A protein has these predicted regions:
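Conserved glycine-rich cofactor-binding loop
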Residues: 7, 14-15
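Conserved glycine-rich Rossmann-like NAD(P)H-binding loop of the short-chain dehydrogenase/reductase
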Residues: 30-44
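Conserved mid-core segment of classical short-chain dehydrogenase/reductases
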Residues: 71, 93-108, 146-149, 186-190
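Catalytic Tyr-X3-Lys loop
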Residues: 85, 93, 100-120, 135, ...
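Conserved NAD(P)H cofactor-binding loop of Rossmann-fold oxidoreductase domains
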Residues: 90-95, 233
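C-terminal substrate-recognition "lid" of short-chain dehydrogenase/reductases
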Residues: 128, 206-230, 235
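Catalytic loop of short-chain dehydrogenase/reductase
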Residues: 133-169, 181-182
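Short, small/polar-rich loop/turn modules that mediate ligand/substrate recognition or access, typified
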Residues: 169-173, 224-225
Length: 237
């Protein structure tokens, strides 16, 4: 793979899906910048696991709700690991609110973390001379009555994906993965069994079904501005 020995930044990669993506990239020889906000203990444990793959890796703390923190994150990664060739925008809020109890501060926070931070990171990475890939993780369902600001911000990320794909071509390809219900790590209790029978595939997704899509995006230099739903077909119902 052409990205062996290159550097990847995965936001929100201390645990859950972000961790699994970081572990996958490390397993195929890609250096990993492990980002976290508050989950320092999880980040330490994940970094320990990642380093078993004998690649360069380090952990970086940043609250992505502020521009200066996004810029400092990239500065620290560049100084520690070097320039970034792969950016996976995984960090996200997931706040419950509806039209009636949503405040402007909620909109500002969710839009900054979910939309503006990916924009800032993408723009700054593009200022270098490298070629690379950006993958935005979103949700199969962005119109959500009870996660109002989350859904709005994820809907906007789809527009960002296409706008960046045009603006950053041909050096970078920017694509999107819209996730449905995914099996949690084996050490995390699940209360999502009711979702298993939703959708044509009648089950939740697996982590390897996400990482195989990421591999495809990394390998292919002619796909950009595309969204792939990994949701067992729920988006077509």
């Amino acid at each position: 793979m052409k990205f062996i020995g290159k550097n990847a930044l995965i936001t929100g990669s201390a645990n859950r899906i972000g961790k699994d993506i970081a572990m996958y990239l490390a397993s195929i020889g890609i250096n990993v910048a492990l980002h976290y906000n508050k989950s320092s203990e999880s980040a330490i444990n994940t970094l320990r696991e990642i380093k078993k793959h004998k690649i360069n890796s380090n952990m970086f703390q940043a609250d992505l709700s502020k521009e200066k923190n996004c810029l400092n994150l990239l500065k620290n990664v560049n100084q520690t690991l070097g320039p970034i060739s792969i950016l996976i925008n995984n960090a996200s809020t997931f706040k419950m609110n509806n039209l009636h109890d949503t405040k402007v501060v909620d909109l500002n926070n969710d839009f900054f973390v979910n939309l503006i931070a990916p924009f800032i990171l993408s723009r700054e990475i593009f200022k270098g001379n490298l070629k690379g890939k950006i993958i935005n993780l979103t949700d199969w369902k962005t119109i959500r009555k009870n996660r109002f600001t989350y859904g709005l911000s994820k809907f906007a990320v789809s527009g960002l994906t296409k706008s960046l794909a045009i603006s950053m071509a041909p050096r970078f390809q920017i694509n999107e993965i819209a996730l449905g219900a995914i099996l949690p790590p084996v050490d995390v209790p699940t209360r999502r069994s009711k979702k298993i029978n939703l959708g044509p595939m009648k089950r939740v997704g697996r982590i390897d079904e996400i990482t195989s899509c990421i591999k495809m995006f990394l390998d292919n230099d002619f796909i950009t501005g595309e969204k792939i739903n990994i949701d067992g077909g729920r988006h077509i119902l």
